């Protein structure tokens, strides 16, 4: 719970600092965080219709992958390379050293200013593979299977009881089958006499 609260405070602080106005620097101390969506087929082009692409993807009319472009507000004369984040690429999207750095995705580093981005990014670098050094570390938590129950919840223990896989059971109606052949049954016990 402490880790979650710390991460929530860090993200809200980054958003609060990012919402302050820029001080006229081309790199920018502060400035609103610019997040947009665009189609993957137009990676090489600048498109400002992110909301249209997001609404088209959300409505189900277009099932192609959408990328999120995160970074500082675009300013005159700034050349900031924005890295695309593919939504359908999974946790280890394109395993290089820059993927998964929280300070860069939130807008840390140059766009939030050297002090906040550098200090917090460097501080978090060893733990979560942050923006400034530190090797890439996988998260400690894994996705639990559908029937898994933790023995000690809240203590980050990996001992678990996994129930066997259950398949959906379908009960079919049992109906009497049609007779194979009609048997001839004589009336009035005909043919059952011994002397016949």
Curated annotation (Swiss-Prot):
Biological process (GO), any one: chorion-containing eggshell formation
In which broad location class does this protein mainly occur, judging by the first location in its UniProt entry?
secreted
Identify the keywords attached in UniProt to this record, alphabetized.
Secreted, Signal
Q: Which domain of life is it from?
A: Eukaryota
An example GO CC term for this entry is: extracellular region
Its localization reads: Secreted
Q: Where is the signal peptide?
A: 1-16
Pfam families annotated for this entry?
A: Chorion_2 (PF03964)
Q: What does this protein do?
A: Chorion membrane (egg shell) protein; plays a role in protecting the egg from the environment.
Q: Which family does it belong to?
A: Belongs to the chorion protein S19 family.
What is the protein named?
Answer: Chorion protein S19
Species annotation? Drosophila grimshawi (Hawaiian fruit fly)
Tell me the gene name: Cp19
């Amino acid at each position: 719970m402490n880790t979650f609260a710390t991460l929530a405070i860090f993200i809200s602080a980054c958003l609060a600092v990012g919402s302050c106005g820029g001080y006229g620097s081309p790199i920018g101390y502060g400035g609103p965080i610019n997040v947009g969506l665009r189609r993957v087929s137009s990676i090489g082009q600048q498109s400002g219709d992110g909301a249209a692409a997001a609404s088209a993807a959300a409505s189900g009319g277009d099932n192609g992958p959408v990328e999120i472009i995160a970074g500082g507000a675009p300013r005159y004369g700034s050349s900031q390379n924005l890295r695309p984040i593919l939504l359908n690429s999974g946790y280890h999207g394109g395993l290089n050293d820059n993927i998964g750095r929280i300070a860069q995705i939130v807008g840390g580093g140059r766009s939030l200013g050297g002090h906040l981005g550098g200090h917090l990014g460097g501080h978090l670098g060893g733990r979560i593979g942050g923006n400034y050094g530190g090797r890439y570390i996988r998260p400690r938590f894994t996705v639990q299977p559908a029937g898994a129950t933790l023995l000690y919840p809240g203590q980050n223990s990996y001992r678990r009881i996994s129930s066997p896989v259950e398949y959906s059971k379908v009960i079919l109606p049992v109906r009497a089958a049609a007779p194979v052949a009609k048997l001839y049954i004589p009336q009035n016990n005909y043919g059952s006499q011994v002397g016949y």
